[in-house]
Regions:
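Non-catalytic, usually N-terminal nucleic-acid engagement modules in DNA/RNA processing proteins
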Residues: 2-125
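Short glycine/proline-enriched loop/turn "hinge" motifs that connect secondary-structure elements
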Residues: 85-90, 185-192, 415
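Short secondary-structure junctions
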Residues: 61-66, 141, 379-383
Length: 467
């Protein structure tokens, strides 16, 4: 048992700088056996200086299929800096690791096979990242590896839970380009890759060669394959992808839990949720969360190691890879009144539509306006124009301008131009109205909500953001 410090023992302040040229004063821990053992070793070796090529060789030796490093000061990573430094103060370099997936497994209409490959490749990549991180730490540089996917910082949910954006780092490190399906396409491995990122205090000499072409072929097969129409030539419909493909992740589980809570009996619950849906959610909770589609990755022919068969037999690629996914009879999860619902009914009438509640629920008024581009539906916004001003007060205050322009959306976090409709209330009140927890009519009658302009336009605006 270590003896307690004597009452008159002076405990040094670790933050107090020592005058230059003065010897370290004996501390209260110097007599400890571990401290004596450390002192006996002598001074530590200076940290190793890493070149980019040597670091890449280390990553490949640890099991990565490709790797590259990029400075945290890279201009494309400015939004990552705050989050990275919070996780590892002193970070100078981000090391992106690439793990290849088996294309045939990802392409299987049996999605259990595809999900097994996602999970296998993800776990393997996390192990690789751990080995590289330990090697860098042993060379004298603090290093850590955030998860390839999960766990995340869920106390921040529904905000940013990830420590670093692997996709942004991969693009900045010249390991690929972002495709229209919003996944990174590697020049060799195509879309069949998973990504991980190391944070390290090491400063790397040199950098990766520039990627001078876009691996995307422009074939648009990802657009054709998406069951909810989330991918368009001029944009990506985030909410459509999130509500279906990620149904068995965070928000989908919360929606199911609320459905259980809302059901007055077991019989009522069975009428709302099928046995297969309940069993599928159980499977994701018991093992790892499963994607409902990811067909955009499955059909992508890009990448030198993947492209050959597509170039030689395009009809066979359509017959053997694309068509089985298009023809598959399955449940597709959509929000009522969304563009995704209309897309499934028109494009895939043989697929079963399952209407669910929107799983994107902003926690504040500011978050509400910031999330609008993610939940906006073009269909209900076509054929009319209007400008809305919102002045929300109280603890959850926010000011915003929302413009609907014949299927397009513009959001500014200040008041701009002359409004057709002007809304004033507390931020908390408006959130409750948006979430249908408060009647807007009663809010007007009680003076909690003041609206100037054509109130019918507010109903049209609400239809653009179905919940």
């Amino acid at each position: 048992v270590n003896p307690p410090l004597a009452p008159d023992t002076e405990v040094p302040d670790p933050t107090e700088p020592r005058a230059e040229g003065t010897a370290a004063r004996p501390g209260p821990y110097d007599a400890h056996p571990s401290a004596r053992a450390v002192r006996a070793r002598g001074p530590a070796a200076p940290p190793r200086r890493w070149t980019h090529d040597a670091l890449r060789e280390l990553a490949l030796a640890c099991g990565a299929d490709d790797a590259a490093a990029v400075s945290l000061d890279h201009p494309e990573l400015a939004d990552e800096r705050e989050h990275v430094l919070r996780a590892l103060p002193g970070t100078r370099t981000l090391v992106c690791l690439v793990g290849r997936m088996h294309p045939d497994s990802v392409r299987s209409p049996a999605r259990s096979v595809a999900n097994l490959e996602f999970h296998r490749a993800g776990q393997a990549l996390d192990e690789v990242a751990h080995r590289v991180s330990v090697a860098l730490s042993e060379s004298g540089h603090r290093s850590l590896n955030p998860a390839m996917a999960f766990p995340m910082e869920m106390d921040a949910f529904p905000g940013r839970g990830w420590i670093v954006s692997h996709k942004r780092v991969a693009v900045a490190a010249q390991l690929g380009r972002m495709g229209i399906h919003r996944s990174v396409i590697h020049p060799r491995f195509g879309s069949f890759v998973l990504l991980a990122t190391l944070l390290t205090t090491a400063e790397i000499d040199g950098g990766p060669p520039p990627l001078e072409f876009d691996p995307c072929l422009g074939c648009r097969l990802c657009i054709a394959a998406c069951p909810v129409g989330a991918i368009e030539p001029d944009g990506f419909r985030f909410s459509a992808c999130y509500d279906h493909n990620y149904r068995e992740f965070m928000s989908g589980f919360a929606d199911l839990a609320e459905t259980i809570a809302d059901s007055p009996s077991a019989l009522s619950l069975r009428e709302r949720v099928s046995q297969s849906e309940m069993a599928s959610m159980w499977q994701s909770l018991s093992y790892k969360p499963n994607y409902k589609a990811a067909y955009c990755l499955a059909v992508c022919p890009a990448g030198e190691d993947v492209l050959g068969p597509f170039l030689e037999r395009r009809a066979a690629h359509t017959r053997d890879v694309v068509k089985p996914l298009l023809d598959k009879e399955e449940t597709v999860y959509v929000v009522a009144g969304s563009d995704a619902e209309a897309h499934v009914q028109k494009r895939f009438p043989h697929k079963k539509v399952r209407v669910v509640r929107s799983s994107l629920r902003p926690p504040s008024a500011v978050a509400l306006f910031r999330s609008m581009p993610l939940t906006f539906q073009r269909g209900p916004a076509k054929g009319w124009k209007a400008r809305f001003h919102f002045e929300l007060g109280g603890e959850d205050a926010a000011r915003a301008t929302v413009v609907i322009d014949d299927g397009a959306l513009h959001v500014a976090h200040e008041l701009e131009g002359e409004a057709d409709v002007h809304v004033r209330c507390e931020g908390r009140v408006w959130l409750e109205i948006v979430e249908k927890r408060r009647s807007p009519v009663l809010a007007v009658l009680t003076g909690r909500l003041r609206v100037r302009g054509d109130r019918a336009l507010l109903s049209k605006l609400a239809a653009c953001f179905p919940r």
